């Protein structure tokens, strides 16, 4: 059904490095109930130690940072994760505005004449991932809003059908 292929680019390794730089390893290891050196080793691509899925889940939950999961998904050519537990149908405008903000950041980086440094590359990737998350949450919030108002859902379905019959969609 799906044809996942592992990327030749070290997305997961880069995500591990970024995660390690972003967080205090001693405090995080204590909160996770891990030895700090074990945590450092598992975040170091040069070491043979690897995270187990429950460890990835725990670190993502403790830090509210999806960098490791996004790196894992990018390694198999998948889009970043979308935390649907943050979904609130009344935040549709907020999701759209944040998505557009991230798109603006990406556009700014794309038209810049500055050299593409590693830091700029990571910032652009983070903007893309955040934008995808916000657009996905926008779509889910819109869907939830339409499901709670059947009349609105019927109007949208009718207009979509009329538009499709005239070749507008």
UniProtKB/Swiss-Prot annotation:
It comes from Escherichia phage 186 (Bacteriophage 186). The keyword Oxidoreductase does not apply. GO terms for molecular function: DNA binding. This is Regulatory protein CII. Keywords: Activator, DNA-binding, Early protein, Transcription, Transcription regulation. The gene is CII. The keyword Signal does not apply. Involved in the establishment of lysogeny. The lineage of its organism: Viruses, Duplodnaviria, Heunggongvirae, Uroviricota, Caudoviricetes. It comes from the Viruses.
């Amino acid at each position: 059904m799906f044809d996942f292929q592992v990327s030749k680019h070290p997305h997961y390794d880069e995500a591990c490095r970024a995660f390690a730089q972003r967080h205090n390893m001693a405090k995080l290891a204590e909160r996770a109930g891990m030895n700090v050196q074990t945590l450092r080793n598992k975040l170091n691509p040069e070491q043979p130690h690897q995270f187990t899925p429950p460890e990835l889940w725990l670190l993502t939950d403790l830090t509210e940072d999806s960098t490791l999961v996004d790196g894992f998904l990018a390694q198999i050519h998948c889009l970043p994760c979308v935390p649907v537990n943050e979904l609130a149908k009344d935040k549709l405008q907020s999701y759209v505005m944040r998505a557009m903000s991230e798109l603006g950041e990406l556009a700014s980086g794309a038209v810049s004449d500055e050299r593409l440094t590693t830091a700029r590359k990571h910032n652009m990737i983070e903007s893309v991932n955040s934008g995808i998350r916000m657009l996905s949450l926008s779509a889910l919030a819109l869907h939830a809003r339409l499901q709670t108002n059947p009349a609105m859902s019927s109007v949208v379905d009718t207009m979509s059908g009329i538009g499709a019959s005239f070749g507008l969609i």
